[in-house]
């Protein structure tokens, strides 16, 4: 149990630091679209899809690594709460089109990235 908790703790810490650094660097790039949040959500969606697809095929790998990457790192990297508050701010500022675009890009983009990761692993594994 300790190894499991430690893996989630380490992964979450690294993911959270990565999210903060990306947001710090990229959110100022656009006054309307929180680019950093979008990037971490899309990258996190891809990583979790890739990890789950790989682990379903590579059952010999210790499941603690899966927890470190998915629950820990991806949980720390991706951010629904920041995404939510950024959309609310856009709505409060009357930027309804930007708010809708942010929602669409984050939700549809994250689903597409997760699906892409599964497709890539399945195509690679079938060769």
Curated annotation (Swiss-Prot):
GO molecular function ontology, one term from the record: fluoride channel activity
Example of a GO biological process term: cellular detoxification of fluoride
Substrates-to-products reaction catalysed: fluoride(in) = fluoride(out)
Transmembrane segments: 4-24, 35-55, 71-91, 101-121
Domain of life according to the entry: Bacteria
Subcellular location: Cell inner membrane
Keywords, in A-Z order: Cell inner membrane, Cell membrane, Ion channel, Ion transport, Membrane, Metal-binding, Sodium, Transmembrane, Transmembrane helix, Transport
The keyword Magnesium is assigned to this record: no
Protein's UniProt keywords contain Transmembrane: yes
InterPro entries: FluC
Free-text activity regulation comment from the record: Na(+) is not transported, but it plays an essential structural role and its presence is essential for fluoride channel function.
Binding site for Na(+): 75, 78
GO cellular component: plasma membrane
Coiled-coil residue spans: none
UniProt topology in membrane: Multi-pass membrane protein
Protein task: Fluoride-specific ion channel. Important for reducing fluoride concentration in the cell, thus reducing its toxicity.
Family statement drawn from the similarity comment of this UniProt entry: Belongs to the fluoride channel Fluc/FEX (TC 1.A.43) family.
The protein, known as: Fluoride-specific ion channel FluC 1
Organism, as annotated: Yersinia pseudotuberculosis serotype I (strain IP32953)
């Amino acid at each position: 149990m300790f190894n499991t908790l430690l893996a989630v703790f380490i992964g979450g810490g690294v993911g959270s630091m990565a999210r903060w650094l990306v947001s710090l660097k990229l959110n100022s790039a656009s006054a309307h679209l929180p680019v950093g949040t979008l990037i971490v959500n899309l990258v996190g969606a891809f990583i979790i899809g890739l990890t789950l697809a790989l682990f379903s095929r590579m059952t010999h790998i210790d499941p603690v690594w899966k927890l470190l990457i998915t629950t820990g790192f991806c949980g720390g990297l991706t951010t629904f709460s920041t995404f939510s508050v950024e959309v609310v701010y856009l709505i409060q500022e009357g930027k309804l089109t930007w708010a809708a675009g942010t929602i669409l890009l984050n939700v549809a983009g994250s689903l597409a990235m997760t699906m892409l990761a599964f497709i890539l692993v399945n195509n690679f594994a079938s060769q």
